[in-house]
A protein has these predicted regions:
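Conserved redox-active cysteine motifs that mediate thiol-disulfide chemistry
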Residues: 53-70
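Thiol-/selenol-based redox modules, centered on thioredoxin-like
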Residues: 139-171
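Thiol-based oxidoreductase modules, predominantly thioredoxin-like and allied folds used
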Residues: 79-97, 112-121
Length: 171
């Protein structure tokens, strides 16, 4: 009986992990902070995309953004960064124009001149429903699937370079 319970628990955990939001390809149709349409097709532009979920209220997020701007330019077509500004919408999915303007100013000030997305309901109810702190960063392959681990908290430029280079070497 004990062995049967263990098998049931292990099977249940495997089932849960296999159906995790992070195991599925990301699909969305949203706008960037400049109002342009953007979808999951953006991931096809590079071998690997670093997705950085951040907030305008988050000091560590903003402090790492200059380094992310440098990182975005370093690896050419093989790599890109996409930011998702988590606090530009409320819990009902309504866009907060004041926060979007704040995000634009932060991007300009920090030199983080990569794509920054206002999350739509499919992002909020999908991959972002498992984000509990910012910054949270994960990597997506060209087909839109999350690869590797999820990173919570900011990192230095050197730390991010090591992580990105390990992804690029395996792709």
């Amino acid at each position: 009986m004990k062995n049967m319970n263990k098998k049931s628990i292990i099977f249940g955990l495997m089932l849960l992990l296999g159906t995790s939001i992070f195991a599925q390809a990301i699909k969305f149709s949203a706008k960037d902070i400049d109002g342009k349409n953007v979808s999951e097709k953006v991931f096809a532009d590079s071998k690997i995309t670093m997705v950085n979920v951040w907030g305008t209220f988050c000091g560590p997020c903003i402090r790492e953004m200059p380094d992310l701007g440098v990182l975005n330019k370093k690896y050419g077509d093989d790599f890109q960064i996409v930011g998702i500004v988590i606090d530009t919408v409320n819990s009902k999915g309504l866009v907060n124009a004041k926060t979007v303007n704040s995000a634009k100013n932060i991007v300009k000030t920090t030199g983080a001149d990569y794509l920054h997305i206002i999350p739509d309901s499919s992002l909020l109810n999908g991959v972002l429903s498992e984000v509990y702190a910012v910054p949270t960063t994960f990597f997506v392959d060209s087909s839109g699937r999350i690869v590797g681990k999820v990173y919570t908290g900011s990192r230095t430029l050197k730390q991010w370079q090591e992580i990105v280079e390990s992804f690029l070497q395996t792709r």
